[in-house]
Amino acid sequence: MTVSGDAIPPHGGTLVNRIASPEQAQELRSKAEHCPILHLDERAQSDLEMIAIGGFSPLTGFMGREDYQSVLETMHLANGLAWSLPVTLPVSAEIAADLKEGQTIALANAEGRLLGLLELTEKFTYDKTREAQQVYRTTDEQHPGVKVLYQQGSVYLAGPVTLLQRDPHPLFPAYQIDPAQSRQLFRERGWKTIVGFQTRNPIHRAHEYIQKCALEIVDGLFLHPLVGATKSDDIPAEVRMRCYEVLIEKYYPKERVILAINPAAMRYAGPREAIFHALVRKNYGCTHFIVGRDHAGVGNYYGPYDAQHIFDEFRPEELGIIPLKFEHAFYCTVTGTMATAKTSPSQPHQRIHLSGTKVREMLRRGEIPPPEFSRPEVAQLLAEAMRERGQPE
């Protein structure tokens, strides 16, 4: 589905919808009673959801071997369409042995609640070390993405999926805006250019600065924080969402910002994930995407601007969405403003660099981040959350 009047078509031209109608859902529930059941972990559940709502268009299910190999080797699907990360369903060899290609498999959560169905078209083994090297550029088990990969099952199941019903998000139902809805909102507001911003951290002054720089040249900002699985030391989603609400209320032009949750899981795949994040935002209807310093990175596995350079490996028309590449922003003590090296006359020692890590360290010590780091309302919320949890963020 693509609607005329949309600012940009979905990736591949059609917005995928794999959510069953109420009538279909009833039939599928009956069918599922006679199917083998597979219990999905948090990442697989969020992947199922993202496929079903069209966030991963053109994917209609979990990848087969041909697409998987092609994505690993070329960052394109087998049909030539740009795609940078494998979206796969791993299971143990024991579970896979009991499943036959051509079967329908019931997909359930850890508690056994039926979520959807998979039409199993293929099952295949894969090389974990090779996938780690290709996707994450490292085989180090300390890398959170590699760690997940090494711990998961050794067989991938492939095939189209159907989600039985779209449930409201348990924590943020008001911010659950799926691609068809975000596109509708952009049309209603008359936005022709929309910039997407991906985050898994509270928004500090550096993020605010680059978002507002982007807002100077586009019609609207789609603030799209990730609320799927993240590292255990990332700040909890409910705290982050409260920070975003306060910021938009006090410091942004509200009519030019839409806040929505992104239910995807974080891979920490750095450059490849930056492309992936851009394509997902294209499906939500964004024409532009902010790529900052060390986008989707972790530790020191990637260079600070590797996630920007990777966009140069694709022709602009292959991606369709325009990356807005920003340098690391800081508070310039010479001009008394936020800036980057492109706009500041300061020397390195006259710059206050901001990072989520620094803020977490300050909070751990019981300190309130200064206004050069964070807006006071955000700093207060983070400090309160730290006290309530009584443990490091």
From Swiss-Prot:
Functional pathway: Sulfur metabolism; hydrogen sulfide biosynthesis; sulfite from sulfate: step 1/3
SUPFAM superfamilies reported in the protein's UniProt record: Nucleotidylyl transferase, PUA domain-like
EC number: 2.7.7.4
Pfam family, one: PUA_2
ATP-binding is among the record's keywords: yes
Catalytic activity, reaction form: sulfate + ATP + H(+) = adenosine 5'-phosphosulfate + diphosphate
A GO biological process held by the record: sulfate assimilation
Species name: Synechococcus sp. (strain JA-3-3Ab)
Keywords annotated in UniProt: ATP-binding, Nucleotide-binding, Nucleotidyltransferase, Transferase
Record's keyword annotation contains Hydrolase: no
Cited PANTHER family: PTHR43509, SULFATE ADENYLYLTRANSFERASE
Protein name: Sulfate adenylyltransferase
GO molecular function annotations of the record: ATP binding; sulfate adenylyltransferase (ATP) activity
UniProt record similarity statement: Belongs to the sulfate adenylyltransferase family.
